[in-house]
């Protein structure tokens, strides 16, 4: 499986497809999330990891999103988007969940196994040691 990855910088970390489903607002706060939301890089914005898999651009604005993506895709059987969206506790339908937007060719068991293996390798390269909150973009700039 050919895999390429790079970083871009965006205005808002919430633009990543998994951001809404991973970072849950802490009650009675405006800007606190569990897991923590990423911090912007001064004068650049929020680092977005782009991973190209089988012609599909996967985007992540925080290591927690990448970890969640890997964790979901490694499950056997693959959970449904309805099961995953119900965990958010809101009346949002499963059609808006990132898993429902993932192309079918990437949901096949063998494709998922390969993708999880490679995404773990990418994670080892782009997540700084000692911090699971931010990507290490310095090696790629």
Q: Each predicted region: which residue ranges?
A:
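Domain-scale terminal segments
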Residues: 24-141
């Amino acid at each position: 499986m050919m895999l390429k990855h790079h970083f871009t910088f965006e205005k808002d970390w919430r633009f990543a497809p998994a951001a809404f489903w991973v970072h849950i607002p802490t009650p009675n706060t405006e800007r606190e999330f569990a897991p923590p939301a990423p911090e912007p890089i001064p004068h650049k914005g929020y680092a977005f990891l782009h991973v190209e898999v089988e012609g599909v651009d996967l985007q992540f604005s925080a290591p927690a999103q990448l970890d969640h993506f890997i964790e979901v895709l490694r499950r056997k059987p693959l959970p449904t988007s309805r099961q995953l969206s119900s965990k958010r506790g809101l009346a949002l339908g499963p059609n808006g969940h990132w898993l429902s937007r993932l192309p079918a060719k990437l949901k096949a068991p063998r494709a998922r196994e390969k993708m999880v293996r490679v995404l773990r390798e990418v994670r080892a390269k782009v997540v700084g040691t000692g911090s699971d909150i931010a990507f290490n973009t310095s090696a790629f700039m």
